[in-house]
């Protein structure tokens, strides 16, 4: 929750409180028989480079015209979960009302007041009221988004954008909060805090490529490093129409996978090489028709062209300017708030641009890798490289781990495999495609010389003529004797 003071004086205060669904806090009981639970906190792994949040809201009567994020560190970090998958904490402030027992009265028991309301529709009327002889105080007064991060078994960077997914399932609820001191006839004062909400702002949270949202009944098995999801669906946006109890997993499209395959024919880099191979097979069967077939082959080769797929990336950027009314410049504080709003919008746009450029960079790298690889000509959806599969270097167990996206030393092995494939592709690129075939044709061309075919035929004809001549002579002698 976040609170913004609207009006304050000595005995009456008005606040605007904003609440939404977020990450579930890990809570514990301070005593076994106590009904109230408090969040589990820690002071380790504090976020560096951020100031501490203010300890209390700004005092004084004023009207707040804008709400600005101001990233800061709370006095303590809350623990979101401690599971086998890891320990997740958050140093962002978690606003809540707390009964102030600084007077050390033994009858006073500090406990948290949270807004655990149940929705009955978007515009449901909700009211919460607390009356106590002890004052209330607002804890964690900073206005900052949640920034969860994992600290065990490994460290991860903070994720200040994930809270938007949880907020989209419920919307942002606005509470009109009044806190006042009621004077009674007795010497004991009464503190009254009332929260009324009649307005919920529905929002929609979306992700951009290459990310998607996997929604459904998700079961994680950390020991097996496996995630099961039955009847799950992929979305790019979510809102309050989704079941708030469902699981949402942010997934990212992979650059590609490497698996060994077998071909039922020799690997060929272009259709022209395939045509030459088929024609040569036919020529070797009918050698005497080589001259006419070769003319047809040369005519066919003239019609075959090799095309290289190139990709152009254009980044379309639009700059929008906003005109502010002169009332925003009446005083320096409003001018400062306006400038801070502009800075926040620019920061959001820069963040979106950074993600877009990262995605475009990945696409360009994929295209570059695709253009560098020598692929089999008869496959367009995937690439079959000429690099032979070595089972000793890359066993099927490693291939299976790669398909399941398991880390460890497998990433290094896959990188080495890519380098070897690229080296093999560069070696193929250094020679003209099909040069070995044409070298074979050059060596076999003398065998297709028709004059060489006539030499053995000429000798056979002479021998046959001599044999016929001998037979005729013998026949003539026989006739004379008769």
Swiss-Prot record:
PANTHER family, A to Z: ENDOGENOUS RETROVIRUS GROUP K MEMBER 113 ENV POLYPROTEIN-RELATED
MF-aspect GO terms: structural molecule activity
Site (Cleavage): 289-290
Post-translational modification: Specific enzymatic cleavages in vivo yield the mature SU and TM proteins.
Pfam families listed in its UniProt record: GP41 (PF00517), HERV-K_env_2 (PF13804)
Lineage, uppermost ranks: Eukaryota, Metazoa, Chordata, Craniata, Vertebrata
Signal sequence segment: none
GO annotations of cellular component type: plasma membrane
Domain of life the protein comes from: Eukaryota
Transmembrane segment boundaries: 459-479
Protein name as it appears in the record: Endogenous retrovirus group K member 13-1 Env polyprotein
Annotated compartments: Virion
Main location: virion
UniProt source species: Homo sapiens
